[in-house]
Amino acid sequence: MDIERLKKVTTIQEFFQITNKGTISDGTKAFLEAMKEVRIPSGQDIVTYGQESDDGMYIILEGIADVYSSSNALINTLSIGDFIGELGLINDDIRAATVRARGEVVCANISKKLFDEIAFENRKVYGTFMNMLYTKTTKLVSERERIKSELAIATQIQTGCLENDFSCFNRLEAVKLTARMRPAKEVGGDFYDMFMIDETHMCFLIADVSGKGVPAAMFMSMAKTHIKNYATLGLPLAEVASRANNQLCYKNEAMMFVTAFICVLDLETNRVTFINAGHNLPFVQKADGDFQMITAKANMVLGMMEDVPYREQYLDLSKGDCIYLYTDGVTEALNPKQELLGDANLTSMLNRHREMAGDADAFVDAMYDEVDAFADGEMQADDITMVYLSRK
């Protein structure tokens, strides 16, 4: 194919260390001249997970391709200049992922057989490629370590934003509570909060931001701050949700949103006022009874549309009663058969441990163990968060 076209691709320039004047080594020239143009129709695999790598390496020249894991989960998107399967030229490993064309994709390709033939005739080709691959790998490792370090700091910051000392609440004569968040990545989009509004009103909530990773964590921090700021003013809960929603909609060009279940417990009347902003419905256990999912109508999620009205709803939480809040990382946990945990399994899990419902920490520990037992080693795909409160 046209070697001059290849020399204009930025990633090829970087990989093969092509100078600004377009000067290349004999080895690089032989390698690029051996490449051929291939067109992959929309929806067709460029490489397929588990297959041999005899077709070698591809470089995208036009179009976009999606990368899928062994479980067919979308994990990355590739575009012009991205390399696909370069390690296939130097080893016999099977493909580690599937790369599928999104629309027609034009690639430059060199097969493993052709690469071996050229390398046999011109050892500079092999040396050039290995040197460039080593340089690229070294840069990737360095960049990965930098990102890992930054994510570790982000994890510490996020952990510090979530309450993990519940002793001040548990000293209250009226409640026993705990909460926990286990992110799917270094940082997550789930969050919870609990705080006293005044001497007789306690707010507790759970929420789930769309997406994962650092963007979700940043949006989470904003949402948590807005909700708490308005709630501590003593505003009606519907107004708290409405104002927080409007703030999250402002300049929200990424169109992120938050599902949330926000509660205010009146310690004198046992009445819980709550707002359900598109979140999973919690379970309540009445004293000496089974856990049952509450019945409630959903409001709009936070951050999706401005000036949306939110309606308050109510439930009673008397002495001995418990409430369990959770995010969809619980019910959408997968087992090796790719089956969802679901509401029915969650109900059974809760009721298997209802005898320990008065011990908040032990109960939440048991629920995490139940989710892990169901997953049976399957990778956690979403943040898993729980909030548990029992009335003394």
Task: For each feature predicted by the language model, list its residue ranges.
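Cyclic nucleotide-binding regulatory module and flanking cytosolic helices
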Residues: 1-44
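A small-molecule sensor/coupling module
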Residues: 27, 113-144
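Short beta-strand segments in beta-sandwich/barrel cores
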Residues: 36, 45, 64-69, 83, ...
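Cyclic nucleotide-binding regulatory domains
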Residues: 44-103
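Short strand-connecting beta-turns/loops that link adjacent beta-strands
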Residues: 52, 70-72, 92, 104, ...
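Short hydrophobic beta-strand segments that form the core of ligand-binding sensory/regulatory domains
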Residues: 88, 97-100, 105-112, 192-193, ...
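… and, occasionally, acidic/histidine-rich disordered N-termini of signaling adaptors
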Residues: 142-322, 373, 378-392
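Active-site-proximal, acidic helix/loop segment immediately C-terminal to a metal-coordinating Asp/Glu
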Residues: 215-233, 317, 321-378
